[in-house]
Amino acid sequence: MGLAYFAPYGVGLGHASRLVMVADELRKNGSNAKFSSFGEAANYIVMRGYRCSMVAPVEFAWSMEGGFSVKDSLANIPLWFANFSRQVNQETRNIAACRPNVVVSDSRLSPVVAARLLKIPSIVILNQVKLLLSPRLRQLAVSRLFESMVGEFMGSMWALADRVLVPDLPPPYTIAAHNVWNIGSTSRKLEYVGFTTPRIQPSERRMEELAESLGIDRSSPLVFVHVSGPFQTRMALVKLALEAKRLLDPKIQFVISEGNAKGDPKPKKIAQSAWYYEWCPVRDEIFAMSDLLVLRGGHVTLSQAIQFGKPVVTVPIENHGEQLGNSTKMADLGLGIMLRHKGLGAGQLADGISHVLSRPEFKKKAEELQRIAEKMDGINNVLQIVRSYL
């Protein structure tokens, strides 16, 4: 029935989770799937029952304060090139050994290059065509020129794929607008397929059971602090959220998820109206029950916020261009507010949460975009495109 070779980016779980969903659907119809990745994504893929070939990591450096480390990332450039070359070699061997009908990359360039070398069709799923510099660096004209030049070069490399799929809404509602627009080398190849996050709507009975087991009062506001991204950046936001909770009205309830895929799935009650998960196995239920989401700014979690019709307070990783771009667009669309991590205090976070909770226009706008998103089934659109090659 055909074989698809899936190659998601290894940092965080968003890239891997959407390809696993596609692979699950293919497997139901008798098609086969193989994976390659690195880091947390590889562990997740194995946990979901698939074999995963490990490849050399190509990732940025992060500070323990929760930010993107420009200095350390620049120092890693020689290692990036070395590991990228290793990735291309590894992927070429892996793909040549199994001869798939199609290679499906999620935000990784090496599988696209390997597929091109082997003359095998390839699809790339991408919500960041170019690398955005931090706002501080972009104040310099030479930095903006550099960003544009690198963006066009990267665009030409991504365009080696037969199809370039953007898991987002079409303009003017594109969340990743800052990361994918205005790049001539890929502009004609971009296909907006809709969000590729699962369309799960927990039953009211299931949510009532969960609320009862945790002791959540459905008549009082519930804030879900869902932390994701590189491990080094998570705890800084978790600690900030814990401090902000103490400053807010006790009636405002909190659920905090550390986002550790290997963590304890059992909740810990940390205050009269606050619960803490190392890994939250009931994330969808908590999303649906919440009145407000506190998120980093990753594309997958923001997509889910829109699909559930929830307003947000985003705290993007400092100097993380993609998350800053996504968060800025969310704020521009009226879906919530963005707070910069650098210098952010618990009082400011508490004020931001109170601000969004007290203004119904944020909720109204989130529900408006939810209705638009419901018209596009991203996972099914990707699935049909992959199936066309099998």
Located regions from the model:
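A short, glycine/small-residue-rich beta-strand->loop->alpha-helix junction that serves as a flexible
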Residues: P8-V20, Q232-M235
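A donor-sugar binding/catalytic signature common to diverse glycosyltransferases
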Residues: V102-D106, V282-N326
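Conserved donor-nucleotide binding/catalytic region of nucleotide-linked donor-dependent transferases
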Residues: G336-I337, K342, G347-Q348, G352-L369, ...
